[in-house]
Design a protein with these regions (language model features):
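Short conserved segment of the HATPase_c
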Residues: 64-77
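Short alpha-helical Gxxx[C/S/T] motif in the catalytic ATP-binding
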Residues: 94, 98
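Short beta-strand/loop element within the Bergerat-fold HATPase_c
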Residues: 41-51
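Conserved catalytic submotifs in the C-terminal HATPase_c
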Residues: 5-14, 50
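Glycine-rich nucleotide-binding loop
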Residues: 52, 63, 92, 115-122
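Acidic ATP/Mg2+-coordinating residue in the GHKL
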Residues: 59
Length: 133
């Protein structure tokens, strides 16, 4: 059993157009991964940046090897750390799914990490035209 602190900083009035269930599942996948790998703290932000919504999920967990960062969105790919995790390690489809959903919504996803310190996933999605006007 872990005791995890989750901090959320979410701007109000953020509207995007898209498939709600898929987008919700994509963000949930990132949060589930953060819970799985964090030592104690997860930070979630959703902020407006001009015409885009930027969602970031950061954990202070095991991190991702630099050589793996370019491959983590590939189908069925698992890092060595993930394969060695004793429980709930999945089959390597979660980040692949997130990547596909984000790109289908004309967005981008990136990951940055420092081994043993943190991992941050950033999703950038276009805001709804209703909000931009």
């Amino acid at each position: 059993e872990k005791h995890i602190i989750i901090n959320a900083d979410i701007d109000s009035d953020l509207i995007i157009t898209g498939h709600e269930v898929s987008l919700r599942r994509a963000v949930t996948n990132l949060i589930d991964n953060a819970i799985k790998f964090t030592k104690s703290t997860i930070n979630i932000t959703a902020k407006r940046n001009n015409l885009y919504l930027i969602i970031e999920v950061t954990d202070n967990g095991i991190g991702i090897e630099p050589d793996n960062l370019s491959q983590i969105f590939n189908r069925m790919y698992q890092t060595e750390q993930s394969r060695n995790k004793k429980s709930n390690h999945g089959i390597g489809l979660g980040l692949y799914f997130v990547d596909k959903v984000v790109h289908l919504h004309h967005g981008t996803i990136t990951a940055k990490s420092e081994l043993g310190v943190f991992t941050t996933f950033s999703i950038t999605l276009p805001l709804s035209e209703k909000l931009i006007e």
